[in-house]
């Protein structure tokens, strides 16, 4: 599926099969989960995408060909995941200080390089992950962005005991499971009046769930905002205890309104999360099967990607949309 221009439907099109260059894997794709970032790209909310573009960055597939100088840890037939961060230069001040997620020359899968809404993709082997055997090809796909970016956001809350989560979509649902596994007190904020989602959060184990316009029964040590809604930032600040942190976990957010300095005072912090690092992935794919994190998915054939987009925009999905692309000769 190809995006020719933002704000236009994706087009089903035959494209040339890619060939792996030095350090790259050729991957036959079996599934690719749909992320809200894909919508931001398709809707023109993120600047300067590669065009025409094959979207998708939660890619699960099997290695079909290995390019020159690929590490011996990868072999033909291996199942791999291809995430958002697709390449960094390894030389800049950020890469040399273990902050490759901030590399000025970074390339991003399904944004500045072609992604996974296709039968094949090439990817830099350094940024591919071996995936836990516990999960099948559909279950594991949402972990490659909602899980990874969510986990990086979660790490920024350190050892905060009282954790608030604003928005209870894909990433929040995954990270809530880790927080509960690690013994955090979880407070979940949804759209005002969304009793169904609040009940779902409480059934999962949240100590409290309410609307984003409510104050929690206790002050929070940290809050993660997964919804791309700027006014949630001052709302979360007001719910924080002294010294607390608000982590903005999305790549895009509507404008943040002004707020009194008193809401920020007493060493409260607002921070964003950008992209991910390979270390994030290694840690996350180690802990995910131990929790074990469970994913909720709804599948679509590749050619119905536009339908998946429309249902995502309308809030009509029952779980993470996952595109089914090829069985690749594998039963999983």
Sequence positions of predicted segments:
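Cysteine-cluster motifs in flexible loop/terminal segments that predominantly coordinate metals
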Residues: 35, 83-129
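Glycine-rich cofactor phosphate-binding loops and adjacent beta1-alpha1 units
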Residues: 187, 195-269, 330-332
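Glycine-rich beta-strand-centered segment in the early N-terminal region that forms part
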Residues: 16-32, 45-93, 127, 132-135
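C-terminal hydrophobic helical "lid"/dimerization subdomain
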Residues: 181, 278-332
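Local beta-strand N-terminus motif with an aromatic residue
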Residues: 77, 219-221, 305
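Mid-domain Rossmann-like dinucleotide-binding core that forms the NAD(H)/NADP(H) cofactor-binding site
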Residues: 133-213
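Residue-level marker of beta-strand positions
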Residues: 58, 78-79, 94, 120, ...
